[in-house]
Amino acid sequence: MNGVSGSDGGIGPVRPASTAAGAGPLRIVRLANFVAPASGGLRTALRELGKGYRAAGHEPVLIVPGERESDRWTEQGRVITLPGPLLPGTGGYRVLTDRRRVARLLEELAPDRLEVSDRTTLRWTGKWARRARVPAVMVSHETADGVLRTWGVPEGAARRAADALNLRTAHTYARVVCTTEFAEREFVRIGARNVVRAPLGVDLVERHPALYDAGLRARHAREDQTLVVLCTRLSVEKRPGTALEALEALLRRGARAVLVVAGDGPLRPRLEQRARERGLPVTFLGHVSDRGALGALQASADVCLAPGPAETFGLAALEAMACGTPVVASASSALPEVIGAAGATAADRGEAFADAVQNLLRRPLAARREAARARAECFGWRTAVDAFLKAHDATASVPAPVTAPVPPFVPGGLG
């Protein structure tokens, strides 16, 4: 091939795309921008969907930007990395900018389906797919108007810009996949008729209440303190500062609380400075790459916060709930739809989040943890994979895996 190589010897033989919808195994080529080693939700979704496509008998291929080119076989299928420049001010995000190289790679791969997880810089691939007669879907991971508002764009201007962007997206792709009704609204608003719903999911075996670690909790909080956890990328659209404001409000009210932040991003230095200047008990862990360690932290918390107002699903919040930990989420996001009555929502202010935390912790410990886990069990990855394959007019060819029993949660000092 031209430019992409690896230990497996390049792209391999080109084969013609299938002509019948969902006929036999499909080569599903997936493209994603704005990924980084320390990014969380998108990388998790890409990995789990790829694993699910493989298990269903299909051939997933993922193309992402990176520091250098590589071509690897992984649990999620083939992963091809093309060199992409760093995006300034994003804390490590890279983008695919060489259109000719990406187009050439797509031609060599000869996909049966194309799945794009970037609605801006990769939108041109929808036109490529039309010319190549390859059915293509775009996955909406964040609302356009929501992101624009978090960047300070006035609401009216953000809505007009989002509508224009979404019209072009809907016209370019065969289908637009939205993970929640919340995400779907901005496309319904413009009259798009090619929108389908497909939720994301959570690994209910990897994330479970038995990950609770009394020793880990004791390292971060005393027995009489509330352990609040924030698992998110520290960037503007995620609004991590709301968590610090909520902690400060709780402390003013006399509550004993500490905050542990798992995540990295461009706002980290500013947040650390704010915590120091205000004397807030905040621990910044940075990016936690060990998924077991992150799960133990989520399971050992009293409550997890999800303050991002533009979230269209909220994987980190769902993972916390699978661990038996309730979530307080932004009422402006899709999270109310995901967490249901098992968590709480709040306006995008620290005081409101503090209110929600205190109200949530008034519920009996066992009841709130059982409710969180039960709600998460509605969102297994098998359901998500089936929905995404349906959006591709693809079929699953293997039975659902048997879920291993989850050990019960044993309370130990929370409350």
Please place each PLM-identified region on the residue numbering:
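Nucleotide-activated donor-binding/catalytic signature segment of Leloir-type glycosyltransferases, i.e.
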Residues: 269-288
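A charged, aromatic-enriched C-terminal amphipathic alpha-helix characteristic of glycosyltransferases
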Residues: 56, 366-393
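Conserved acidic donor-binding segment of nucleotide-sugar-dependent glycosyltransferases
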Residues: 340-351, 358-365
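Donor nucleotide-sugar binding/catalytic pocket of nucleotide-sugar-dependent glycosyltransferases
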Residues: 64, 80-83, 159, 163-212, ...
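Short hydrophobic beta-strand element within catalytic cores of glycosyltransferases
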Residues: 326-329
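Conserved donor-binding/catalytic core segment of Leloir-type glycosyltransferases
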Residues: 211, 216-217, 221-248
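Short alpha-helical donor nucleotide-sugar binding micro-motif in glycosyltransferases
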Residues: 287, 295-301
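Aromatic "clamp/platform" in nucleotide-sugar-dependent glycosyltransferases that forms part
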Residues: 309
